[in-house]
């Protein structure tokens, strides 16, 4: 996404690193870093929030791993990650986490003559492609899923993330659930030892590399596929149904997320049941310090998140993200008041 935001003091163009800056005449602009998955909606929210409140926001779309490192190092007010931190790591680093949005990860392909949503894949076949066991697009396993589609003999060019990525975590978490070979040989994390393929930095890098590579395949958050006019695949889900990526299919997966019953809101939503469920769904969590050094900046950040939960729903919907239910938002705000404090008082003063 190409987007320029200007103010009297700064004119920054978003490029490969996808850093957007909204400048405001306040002592402490909001600052965050991490997930590329949430970046498209963060960018839109930031635009509107600037117009509504005059408060600036700087968010670096550098991947979940980078966001975790920066918030721990206190170089930003908040981090964003698509892989929730463990209870032990949250406690060790004095952090709290809460979900911001949910959405879908889609396989993207560059196949001449194949339109978005025409190709069908499943988890086992996707794992075999990323293991390097399936190497051409006319392989019998792919043809079996696409009997009415004429597939070329083009070599498959695998593209994966080169940076620490929550998108990679959820993608590989899904493959682990569908492929014993993948589980044994590769596993799931924000960064893995890829058996084959080339790495690209960020979702932007994956999207651009696939777009430029004949026979390419990669994985990105759905908004990147739409915004870059990339061909994406349908998927065979846990119920054995072929489904398209959409707000509805992501919502079906999200409906299984029991955030209320999960400590630290730690819920993974890959390969969930249901006829209409998209199988590679994911959430993004915000990470923020319990006892922040800059209470004012943290308070402003929490105001922004509260605004996004309430007034950012339509923007999220337009980009095919699923909003966090109001009942869960109430729990999140209660956790802010209980857990994020300075001088013995809650940093968040909202409702």
From Swiss-Prot:
Descriptive protein name:
Phosphate-binding protein PstS
In the UniProt record, what gene is named as encoding this protein?
A: pstS
Q: Where in the cell is it found?
A: Periplasm
NCBIfam families, per this entry? 3a0107s03 (TIGR00975), PRK10918.1 (NF008171)
Please provide, alphabetically and separated by semicolons, the GO molecular function terms listed in this UniProt record: phosphate ion binding
Q: Which SUPFAM superfamilies does the UniProt entry name for this protein?
A: Periplasmic binding protein-like II
CDD domains given for it? PBP2_PstS
* Quaternary structure and partners: The complex is composed of two ATP-binding proteins (PstB), two transmembrane proteins (PstC and PstA) and a solute-binding protein (PstS).
Q: Which species does the entry assign this protein to?
A: Mesorhizobium japonicum (strain LMG 29417 / CECT 9101 / MAFF 303099)
An example of a Gene Ontology cellular component annotation for this protein is:
ATP-binding cassette (ABC) transporter complex
Provide the family line. Belongs to the PstS family.
Question: Which positions does UniProt annotate for phosphate binding?
Answer: 35-37, 64, 82, 165-167
Per the UniProt entry, what are the Gene Ontology biological process annotations, in alphabetical order?
Answer: phosphate ion transmembrane transport
Leader sequence range is: 1-27
Q: Has keyword Cytoplasm?
A: no
Highest taxon, organism lineage: Bacteria
Q: Which UniProt keywords apply?
A: Periplasm, Phosphate transport, Signal, Transport
What does this gene product do? Part of the ABC transporter complex PstSACB involved in phosphate import.
Which Pfam family is one of those matched by this entry?
Answer: PBP_like_2
